[in-house]
Amino acid sequence: MAKLDFDRSKEHVNVGTIGHVDHGKTTLTAAIATVLSKKGLSEARDYASIDNAPEEKARGITINTSHIEYQTEKRHYAHVDCPGHADYVKNMITGAAQMDGAILVVAATDGPMPQTREHILLSKQVGVPRMVVFLNKCDMVDDEEMIGLVEMEIRDLLSEYGFDGDNAPIVRGSALKALEGDAVYEDKILELMNAVDTYIENPVKELDKPFLMAVEDVFTITGRGTVATGRVERGRLTLNEEVEIVGLKPTKKTVVTGIEMFRKNLKEALAGDNAGLLLRGVNRDDVERGQVLAKPGSIVPHTEFEAAIYVLKKEEGGRHTPFFKNYKPQFYFRTTDVTGGVEFEAGREMVMPGENVNLKVKLISPIAVEEGTKFSIREGGRTVGAGSVTKIVK
């Protein structure tokens, strides 16, 4: 089949299926693609092609993820589905697959299970704003009352973790029946996508966020001044705008008097650009790798925060042994490592390889971080874990 043209007139939204093992996440993903393909809005995909998820690397961690794309009348979607529970945890914590909203799949035959709870919590921690629920396998439950009870249980669970349990849409259906072409259940897939279209909000575009660029390198141009290079993470910057140099040292304000990309002078730098910024009145020693250049007042340096972390298993190249309270690894933010200590939640003595835990981190130097900032945990340059900042402490 010919490649679908990328239609820029449609809003682009990133979604993903989450939920307990064997509740039907991958079958639902295949059903969405297949039902929409009948309207010419997607390529049909079978279960096997999605389940056979390719490996990718994010922050030094290997993750299996399937990416598929499809359209509705309103939007263009990128949809991620992971084969295993650990892949979900790693995906969310590394931010490898950004989600503007999630489709929570719950089997009506089982109701919410341990991983249902875990995925909802993780979604909240990494900042997934909204969730739509697909109640799967409804063809296997005869008792209407039973399905109603499962729905109530899901709403309570969503509310417990800070989602809007009262108003989240819950669509009843059967992904397998829809995939097999049963018209009644195909309509349920369209009903689900309609809920996703309306309930999951358009994301704030990276360009509309306040400017931020992590400094990768610094050099001096004789007679002109100091240039900091890096990739613009978000926002836009125009010539002669003020920026702050944040992190590692006291925050300092400067004006950008030149923007260069591929040896050409530009009037502005945009999210995604690799740019060199000429900084007025800044010495070579005032700015270093690991700091960020940001819109004044938009981000401040911190040393203490809470985080959700995933610790790599031995088989994934991680530690072979647990770590304890006096553990002091390096925390790699954007472009640099900073040493820090960890504090566990009450009652926890150690953290085992393969665990997903919440802990408090205290860095020895302040770094520009905010809720949602992602980092790697490293020992001597080797990645042993990944984390996402869930709450700023200091």
From Swiss-Prot:
Q: What are the boundaries of the region G2? A: 60-64
Q: What is this protein called?
A: Elongation factor Tu
Query: Can you state which reaction this protein catalyses?
Result: GTP + H2O = GDP + phosphate + H(+)
Q: Where is this region: G4?
A: 136-139
Q: Which residues bind Mg(2+)?
A: T26
Keywords, A to Z?
Cytoplasm, Elongation factor, GTP-binding, Hydrolase, Magnesium, Metal-binding, Nucleotide-binding, Protein biosynthesis
Q: Choose one Gene Ontology CC annotation of this protein and give it.
A: cytosol
The task this protein performs is described as: GTP hydrolase that promotes the GTP-dependent binding of aminoacyl-tRNA to the A-site of ribosomes during protein biosynthesis.
PANTHER family for this protein: ELONGATION FACTOR TU, MITOCHONDRIAL, ELONGATION FACTOR TU-RELATED
One example GO MF annotation: GTPase activity
Q: Which domain of life is it from?
A: Bacteria
Q: Native species of this protein?
A: Mycoplasmopsis synoviae (strain 53)
Please classify the protein's predominant subcellular localization into one broad category: cytoplasm
